[in-house]
Amino acid sequence: MFDIHTVEIEWAGRPLKLETGKIARQADGAVMATYGETVVLATVVSAKSPKPGQDFFPLTVNYQEKTYAAGKIPGGYFKREGRPSEKETLVSRLIDRPIRPLFPEGYKNDTQVVVTVIQHDLENDPDILSMVATSAALTLSGVPFMGPIGGARVGYINGEYVLNPHLDEMDESSLDLVVAGTQEAVLMVESEAKELSEDVMLGAVMFGHRGFQPVIDAIIKLAEVAAKEPRDFQPEDHSALEAEMLSIAEGELRTAYKNTQKAERYAAVDAVKAKVKAHFFPEGVEPKYSAEVIGAVFKHLQAKIVRWNILDTKSRIDGRDLSTVRAIVSEVGVLPRTHGSSLFTRGETQAIVVATLGTGEDEQYVDSLTGMYKERFLLHYNFPPYSVGETGRMGSPGRREIGHGKLAWRAVRPMLPTAEQFPYTLRVVSEITESNGSSSMATVCGTSLALMDAGVPLAKPVAGIAMGLIKEDERFAVLSDILGDEDHLGDMDFKVAGTDGGITALQMDIKIEGITEEIMNVALNQAKGGRLHILGEMAKAISESRGQLGEFAPRIEVMNIPVDKIREVIGSGGKVIREIVEKTGAKINIEDDGTVKIASSSGKEIEAARKWIHSIVAEPEVGQIYEGTVVKTADFGAFVNFFGARDGLVHISQLASERVAKTQDVVKEGDKVWVKLLGFDERGKVRLSMKVVDQATGQELAAKKDDAAE
């Protein structure tokens, strides 16, 4: 019934198994991949023909984690997996980026990749395995795909590169780098690092590329016995059309792209496009080509013209040379009632970034396959349509916004103080108000400025820059701080963020083969120069964190209480802690280890809550004087509440220096009195004295010390 084919290899010390022919047989390609004991199912389905009028390649990648994979039931009211989590969205993008360039130009059939995590051993992250399984499924499917690709994670522990480190090893690693590519070339890099040099980062990329070669060999071996017949796809040849269009439009397009003003340049290009359309769609004559074909070829021609201009003249669309960064204006404190804010403008790219400080109860709970954890640093990136002068949908963030926000998050996180050093939850929101290239890197710069403005003690300021690379035969040009128009025409786009001491995040997408290690090294070092320049411009606004928090930011005081006292502070059903919060106005968060965080914008509220909690958990000291309230009187003395919920007896002989006949002659219930703790009797009962304390001042009466001790 089943025609099963399997290939197994040992990879980075663990078995990797790829199997096809048993599961999901109606998909064009399906592979069950196992690494250690983590299992994913990758499927590929591609329509047999494109939709009429389709002018782009509709590729969708859906990565999904099933909670049963880790023996869990979804949390929340509905016990079913819902909308994609942030990780699912990010891994979907991670798989998409290296496979998209390997589909032939002109292939426009609707294609969907679905990757499902069906078992997780809590040791091997499913993202790398998902990339490998997708590559195998595409290679077997018969869909035109110029793969296979491999992928690997690289760690850097104790000065050594580690291939596919276990999840628990990543805590010790100063690098988390994912690299994917073919046998000959690197196609994609995504990473977070703790201030590593360009050489170490590039070394990690090449180490990973070498590391996944056995995986590519295994996929090829499986394809030799299990691959379907390749589909007959011949991309349309538009070389004659392109040559004809070039003869009409080359001169005017070159002139248009010498215009350094974006709006004027766009108008000039539109005029050339109108001229081209008039040539190919004469009135009263049946056109030889469709509007979609003319549009696609014209777009291709635009890219060629810009590339030729840059390589020939070493001058960019906006008049800059290859390494110049656009003019930068950095401002902080632009929204004075917020906790921290900045406005970062680089050319026609601009971001308003706002930092908000919160308490422990503001932390984000994340329910992952590996377990529930709390995230104390949140970064949200918003890209409204007006930022590029367009109308569009507004609503929940798309994949691009989530991906850009995560890149900025990775860039800044290594410089944040620990929770012990700075016990605040941090939320940063980046509102992109203008965009013409590299809004994610503007977010990195703006986030660094806003956090420093808020008084967050960053180890160092962080800046980011977007780079491009154009290569024609042996000639190449590396572009610093690319424009939106330059973003898609390059052969390598990469974004580098870091401090003056090293790289904290690197994202790289390479679209062609032939980008050598030497070329990447040149590009990374040019990016370093740009990053240092941007850091210098940012320092004109603020160069280090403010010494104090903003006026409207909450203050947090941390105290530690014995673990066995936590129950007393919380009270039955939370009664005590609710009362403290209601009466003092402070927010209180108690950790399982006895760490108590008290937060309020008012120092008085914090102090009131701290004293209250201290009175509950602390033990009264013998010989100390306390203020108390008489709660009960008796013939033999008065009971005084003097230390939180603690009561003690003032014997009738200790009420006053003279002889007292009746307790009520000296005190009544509700009276405020000063008492000294004399000690405890043999049954542990508290012994108090009023007569040794001046009831007007609360000071001890020295002359009476000996009497009280009797």
Swiss-Prot record:
**For binding Mg(2+), which residues are annotated in this chain's numbering?**
487, 493
Cysteine pairs forming cystine bridges in this chain are none
Q: Which GO terms describe its molecular function?
A: 3'-5'-RNA exonuclease activity; magnesium ion binding; polyribonucleotide nucleotidyltransferase activity; RNA binding
Q: What is its EC number?
A: 2.7.7.8
Give the CDD domains listed for this entry: KH-I_PNPase, RNase_PH_PNPase_1, RNase_PH_PNPase_2, S1_PNPase
**GO annotations under biological process?**
mRNA catabolic process; RNA processing
The record's section on InterPro entries has: ExoRNase_PH_dom1, ExoRNase_PH_dom2, ExoRNase_PH_dom2_sf, KH_dom, KH_dom_type_1, KH_dom_type_1_sf, NA-bd_OB-fold, PNPase
Q: Which GO terms describe its cellular component?
A: cytosol
Sum up the protein's function in the record's words: Involved in mRNA degradation. Catalyzes the phosphorolysis of single-stranded polyribonucleotides processively in the 3'- to 5'-direction.
Family membership, please give it: Belongs to the polyribonucleotide nucleotidyltransferase family.
Its protein name is Polyribonucleotide nucleotidyltransferase
Q: Which organism is it from?
A: Rhizobium rhizogenes (strain K84 / ATCC BAA-868) (Agrobacterium radiobacter)
Taxonomy of the source species: Bacteria, Pseudomonadati, Pseudomonadota, Alphaproteobacteria, Hyphomicrobiales
